[in-house]
Amino acid sequence: MLICFSSSHRTAAFDLLDQLERHAPAVATALAEHSELVTGSVVLATCNRFEAYLDIDEPLPAARAVSAETVIAAVGNAAGIDADLLRSSSRVYCDDAAAEHLLSVSSGLDSVVVGEGEIAGQVRRALTTARQAGTVSQDLERLFQVASRTSRGVKNRTGIATAGRSIVRLALDLAESRVSDWSRMRVLLIGTGKYAGASLAALRDRGVADVQVHSPSGRAEKFALSHGVTAVPAGGLGAALAHAHLIVTCTTVRDYTLTPGNFGQAQQQDGIERRLVIDLGLPRNVDSAVAELPGVELLDLETISLHAPVAELNAADDAREIVGAAAAEFAAQTAEQAVKPALIALRKHVFDILDAEIARARTRGDSSEQTEAALRHLAGVLLHTPSVRARELARAGDAQRFADAAETLFGLRIEEAPVHPRLIAVDRVTAS
């Protein structure tokens, strides 16, 4: 059974998402420790959502509520969040609904800005991280691969990518009313990751030329060289803040990058009456108390999300149609898994009889390679129609009818499908 625990901008306050993101590694570890229940897990933590996709070793519908409560308790304990608060701030999707939700998420349909392009890469990286940790089951691997293919299909076949704007560009759009001339703006960029690159590109599109970069992790020099900007030297953050009209933060550090104390020198700077700080980080990069400083305005993800535009309806509808079709096909393929044990048993039964007859013919000297090949081909032909019919029944939810018929007609003993083991990361295999 697949379960998705989802807490996002649609269901939770950004403070709660902030706390969940900070504890993402602990949550992933806690979920993996429930090996008696969880056979696979992938944790997706982005700037506006926290989700855990789980493969649960319990197919009975009655166990869904118990499994969901177990997941909520594990997440709450690992993140230090009350279970009742977590329950009221999240949604739990099961099986087909969980699959369709991931396909919608990876295609940008569930984002703050519908159609934003960053989420597809974040979904892929979440899968990579889970692979490295050895927590991906075969069913989760298949689901996430379908999600990646679906997001590519949505991007290539609809206009949703252009209808929606990225978080970075939306933030700068909101800042437009505060800026009279982008070419004269002095900008401090804090962070050197993917969002920093996207922010720099968006700033340059608006004509910004004076950009300094600061990195809490010490990567400013490398970023500056590759992007043609100025690196803030060690100990130079205060001076850089004093120089800047606009500060954009987009780091993944756990602690605040900017607090009111960082602005002491900047507050004394002449000539800058108002500074705008755009916080694109989650966890938050900027202490909310910064907004109380005179002459400082703070624009954070929570504020940005309130202004997210509605996507062009046609593009969104086309994207949803693609996602719906992909989700239906995934559900159908998943349903086919239920008939596999019966098909395997039937094929084994037929080919065991065939092998026995060929062996008897050989003892009589009546066999030839051509005859054996013809008989094996005939067996395959005879099995084709029952195999097709079995999959059709499975897709219609009637897999048990085929299993019952096979048991009745052929006296087969059909074993239950084994639980898929977790997929071990390649580097772990080679290292052992």
UniProtKB/Swiss-Prot annotation:
Keywords: NADP, Oxidoreductase, Porphyrin biosynthesis
Single GO molecular function: glutamyl-tRNA reductase activity
Binding of NADP(+), residues: 191-196
NADP is among the record's keywords: yes
EC number assigned by the record: 1.2.1.70
Gene3D superfamilies, sorted: Glutamyl-tRNA reductase, N-terminal domain, NAD(P)-binding Rossmann-like Domain
Family: Belongs to the glutamyl-tRNA reductase family.
Name the UniProt record assigns to this protein: Glutamyl-tRNA reductase
Protein's organism: Leifsonia xyli subsp. xyli (strain CTCB07)
